[in-house]
């Protein structure tokens, strides 16, 4: 039986914990959708979401649409069986 293809959507540090748990339990995460990198602090350091850091560590494709309502085709193209959302930050 083929593994379920999962797209994960999340941004907050809580989301990172959910994603790590899925990966450690051998779920088939085929893509991660998260908010775009943001400038943080007084020095305006460009910072990526923690979820993106985890995805890159596991060589999972990352998608960072500014507005998911206008840019969802890349998710559809992955043909996921399931989408899991945890604190994504936009209405889906």
Range-by-range predicted roles:
Residues 1-92:
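One-carbon transfer enzymes
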């Amino acid at each position: 039986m083929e593994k379920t293809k999962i797209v994960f959507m999340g941004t907050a540090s809580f989301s990172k914990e959910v994603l790590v748990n899925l990966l450690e339990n051998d779920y088939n995460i085929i893509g991660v959708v998260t908010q775009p990198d943001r400038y943080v602090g007084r020095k305006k350091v460009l910072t990526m979401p923690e979820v993106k850091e985890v995805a890159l560590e596991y060589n999972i494709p990352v998608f960072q649409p500014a507005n998911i309502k206008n840019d969802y085709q890349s998710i559809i193209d992955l043909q996921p069986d399931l989408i899991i959302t945890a604190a994504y930050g936009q209405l889906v």
